Amino acid sequence: MSSVVVVGTQWGDEGKGKITDYLSEKAEVVARYQGGNNAGHTIVFNGEKYKLHLIPSGIFYSDKVCVIGNGMVIDPKALVEELAYLHERNVDTSNLRISNRAHVILPYHLKLDIVEEERKGANKIGTTKKGIGPAYMDKAARIGIRIADLLDKEVFEEKLERNLVEKNRLFEKYYEVGGFNKEDILDEYYEYGQQIARYVCDTSVVLNDALDEGRRVLFEGAQGVMLDIDQGTYPFVTSSNPIAGGVTIGSGVGPSKIHHVVGVSKAYTTRVGDGPFPTELHDEIGDQIREVGNEYGTTTGRPRRVGWFDSVVVRHARRVSGITDLSLNSIDVLTGIKTLKICTAYKYRGEVVEEFPASLKVLAECEPVYEELPGWDEDITGVTSLDELPVNARHYIERVSQLTGIPLTIFSVGPDRKQTNLVRGVFA
């Protein structure tokens, strides 16, 4: 039995999809455990680029079982469209399994996301407007509709009817916008359910059976630790738990069955949307990193905010997620920058702070403490081992590992999976 969790150590977009794809070669089962289609990941497979939002990265390997776990919220329309996108490119999806306990995103969740963000105005949190938060709210309020409900038209109609009474009152009385008729949703979404019915099962059984049989299971996190609803920069976070602990809740696998946690970081830091970002760059270097690294959101297309590597953030991620292995991505993007900086701590009112603050007010007053390192000009995109790297690039990677306290397992020097290099294995 061997299981590995892949988590983002920053604010998402660290390249988890590529690392999951890379590790999928050794895995036999690949599972997602939280989030929804608010998370995009780009994978290059056989020279072709694919953008996925819901389906696990392992889908390109027909011999791997791919699981959408119970902790996810699923937009059935988006899922059907993503399946069609893969089928058009001759990707076999018969290896997909969808949890019957996962919750469903419906049109009123999407509309609620939009009107609530508009209502907040300057206080908006930068949601992707995919209905994720409202769907998780319904789940917590125990009025959510699950995949199992969607497949039973009588149950679906009953729950939909009940929910629309409340949602329409909210739309009309509070937001002063129009609501929905049952007919707007029922038949269309029931049909989506029928299109995915062949994939639906109890995925907790699938995963636990696989582990008990000694198969290698890879859990793929979405977003990143700093977007975790409990451990992230609240309230500028997602509505679920991307940390490794979220695996047990979102997949139905007990904590004793988790063996390795790979933390994925960029060699710098990025963020989409609003919220604190201590090492953010507003200069030509930031623009250079954004353009060279193509730092635009997979889901939204929004330019990502860019900053120096922040070891305070990644140390926090290591602690709350139990990270055992570091995957450092996009090192090549830093090529040509004369002097590089790594944030080693913060300074708050004259005091050095080494742990990430919970208070956004405190964080807003924190100034990064930087360590400067010399850069490199050599092209490193063809490098296949640490020994082939320029001395300064190797020193930069070593310093990141030292400051975060996480041993290096993987490093990446470009977007293609062939530019991903293994330093040590994670699967038994």
Swiss-Prot record:
Superkingdom in the source lineage: Bacteria
An example Gene Ontology molecular-function term: adenylosuccinate synthase activity
Record's subcellular location: Cytoplasm
Pathways involved: Purine metabolism; AMP biosynthesis via de novo pathway; AMP from IMP: step 1/2
Chemical reaction(s) catalysed: IMP + L-aspartate + GTP = N(6)-(1,2-dicarboxyethyl)-AMP + GDP + phosphate + 2 H(+)
Note on cofactor: Binds 1 Mg(2+) ion per subunit.
Protein function: Plays an important role in the de novo pathway of purine nucleotide biosynthesis. Catalyzes the first committed step in the biosynthesis of AMP from IMP.
Listed name of the protein: Adenylosuccinate synthetase
UniProt source species: Halalkalibacterium halodurans (strain ATCC BAA-125 / DSM 18197 / FERM 7344 / JCM 9153 / C-125)
